[in-house]
Each structure stands twice: as structure tokens, then as C-alpha cells.
Amino acid sequence: MRYYRITIIRFINKYTKIMDWIESDSYLKGIINNKPKLHDPVRVASFDLDDTLIVRSKKTQKWKLVDSSIKQKIAELIENKYIIIVFTNQGGMSLNKKFDKPLWRKAMDDLVKILTSETDNDFYFAIYVAKKYDIYRKPNIGLWNLMKQDIKDEFNLDSVQISTKSFFCGDAAGRIYPSMFKKKLYPTSKGGDFSDTDRKFALNIGIKFLTPEEFYLDSKNSENLKTNYKLSGVNPTEIIDEIENTKLVNYKFKPRKKEMIVMIGQPGSGKSFFVKNYILPNGYVHINQDKCKTKAKCLSETENALSKGKSVVIDNTNPDVISRMTYTNLAKENNYDHVRAIIMETPDELAKHLNNVRHIYSSGTVPKVTDIAYNIYRKNFVLPQYEENFDKIETVTFYFDKSMLDDPKWKRSFMKFSEYK
């Protein structure tokens, strides 16, 4: 029965070229398939959408093809046994309440019809859309993994082997100066690429990366099309090399009786790792808002621990005087003489990368801290002073525990390039 259903769907798809759309909370995907089988290994010709395949009007939803040669090139790719895939970040779908998704899907159905108008061959064409800032958003490879699973299901395969001829083409390449196409599409633009997420996406997958110029112009002397680029944020390989070739000195934590410790640091700075490995083994009560859920519950648990004369560690971001003194005043009221501030000194780009690593490692169950939260932290941050009831203020440079690299999944998560703004 399933075979006949798939055959009918393929027949309908071939002549209507209407995609079968499926939506989840995090992604939207549309697939049109009329191929009975795939080339093995699978040849994937994948593309970004905006300013790679189409250029969109900023005022309306109207669009046009970036280059007129795209239809013939898609036909040639299909002739050469490639499947055609689009991977696109569309955060506006979740952030903009006025985003017209039915209209957008209709535009994509029209795009598929146009892009495949010059081929009579059977084809597999899919569009994968990341709606949120999570594991599916490029350069994270959630959409790529979703594509592989869909191929397995669609063709009843045990595994999917990707051909070395596969590639991803996108305009977010981290180029420093305006590209040839950018000058053509946006004549007044003087800056380079707005992002580098497309290049990082290809690097994270491990397939060839092409800029639109390299794909469309197909120059024999491709060096003329290459421009200088710079990847933002952390280069995971460089960090790993530094860790494996550097003798790191452990922080010497000295516990004190009847003490309150207030941790200070942005999300992803290593506070909780530090607390778990250095402070909690000494019997300190752990106060963390992710566990308590509310500020009131945190304060209640802190008050309870202090009333029993226990040492406590406040494991929150605590960027400003008010957030810190809410706790240090409790210590003073309970006659605590030992109140220590520990500042986690972690580079911004590394903290954001670790935020993404934590999200990937958890398979998306631990949500990413938003850029807005980072901006609020930076805006509110004030260095702690002794006048806040502290008798000791320490700064800890981020310490990377080599043992974390023994976990293959964690190392794979860390080695993926992340988006950095």
C-alpha cells in the first residue's frame, strides 16, 4: 500500500510541481520527489536562498532570480544525478507575527516550477527552513541531518552516503569586500558579506563551498572569483590545538567556613563548570536560578542555607550591583564575614561558542541563550566593589578541562563553527 501511495505522490508531484510541506515548531520543510531511486553515493547540490537563488524586494514579497542562467544549471545538475536542496534561515517566521507563511510557501512553489522548467528528468527538490535560533539554524547542521533522515525514509535506505561531489552555495561567505554580485544587486553597498554562516555551514558538514559567483560564472580561472574572507568568532581547531599543546595551570580554590560566593559572568563563560568542579566538592550549597526557576525561590533557599550556617555559592550571571547585593545583604544580615566575588573572565566569542556547544550537545533540549540576553548583560555589567559587602574579589581566567575532549559527542559539538554576531 505504501509503495502505491508513494508512486501516486510522485506522479502528482511530477506534473503539478507542488511541494509537500511539513512544519514543526523549529523548522519548515517542503519536498517534491518523482525519482524512483537515487544515485549512490547521493550527490547533493545545495543552496542558500536569498541573494543566492533569488533577490527579494525589501518592501514587498516580490522576488526575481539572481541570475538567468540558474534554470539551465539546475537542469544540468539534475541530468548529472544531483538532488537539489535549499537550506535557508528565516528567523522572521518566528519573530515577526505578521510573516505570511502561506504566501511564502506559494512563492517557493512558484520558484521550484521556474527552477525546474528546463528539465524533463525526474528530480528530487527540497527546501529546508530554520525558523528559530536553534540546532536547525545555519551554521548548525540540524537541517542537513533532517535532509539525510528524509532521504532514508523516502527511499527506504539503511544509511545515506554523501558523494564528494556534493556542495553548498551561499552568499554569506565572510568576504571582507563587496562581491561581484553584491555590487550588481545592491549598487550603493560598500561593505562585505553580512555574515559567514554559509561558509561555516559547509565547513561543519564537510562538503565543498561555493560563492554564487563561483557557481554561476563557472570561470576556468576561478582564482579571479575568490576574495579575501574572515570567519567571525572562535575557530574550534585553533582552540583545541592550544588546549592539547599547552600545559594549563589549575585554579587554586581555597574554601572558607561559613562563606557566600557570588559568581559573576556572562552566559557560557564557564561559571557552572567552575562551580561544579571547584566549589561544590567542598560542601557549598548550590543556588542556581535554572534550578530554582524563580528569583524568589533562589532567595528563599539562600536564606534557608544561611540560617543553618552553611556555605553557599550563587551561580547566576549577577552583572550589576543590585543583583549581587540582593544576596550579599542576606549574608550580612546573617553575620557572614566571608563574602567572595568570583569573576569569570571569558572572551565574548568563546562564551557564545560554548553557549552553542551546550545547545548542540543536548540535541537542542538546553535552549540557547539569546543575543538579547548577552547585550543586556554587557549593558548592565559593573565590576564588583568591596562596598557591596565583599571581603574578597577574585578573577578567574577561563579554564578548559582537557577531560571534556574524552567525550566524543562533546568534542564533535565543540568542533562545529558557530554563528557569531
From Swiss-Prot:
Q: Which reaction does it catalyse?
A: a 3'end (2'-deoxyribonucleotide 3'-phosphate)-DNA + H2O = a 3'-end 2'-deoxyribonucleotide-DNA + phosphate; a 5'-end dephospho-2'-deoxyribonucleoside-DNA + ATP = a 5'-end 5'-phospho-2'-deoxyribonucleoside-DNA + ADP + H(+)
Any one biological process term the GO annotation gives: DNA repair
Q: Where does ATP bind?
A: G265, Q266, P267, G268, S269, G270, K271, S272
Q: Name one Pfam family in it.
A: PNK3P
Keyword Cell membrane listed? The answer is no
Q: Which UniProt keywords apply?
A: ATP-binding, Hydrolase, Kinase, Multifunctional enzyme, Nucleotide-binding, Transferase
What residue spans carry the region label Phosphatase? 25-231
Q: What Enzyme Commission number does this protein have?
A: 3.1.3.32, 2.7.1.78
One Gene Ontology term of the molecular function aspect: polynucleotide 3'-phosphatase activity
**Annotated region described as Kinase, given as residue ranges:** 235-415
- InterPro entries (UniProt xref): HAD-like_sf (IPR036412), HAD-SF_hydro_IIIA (IPR006549), HAD_sf (IPR023214), P-loop_NTPase (IPR027417), PNK3P (IPR013954)
The protein's matches in NCBIfam families, at most eight in alphabetical order, are given as:
HAD-SF-IIIA
Tell me its family.
In the N-terminal section; belongs to the DNA 3' phosphatase family.
Q: What is this protein called?
A: Putative bifunctional polynucleotide phosphatase/kinase
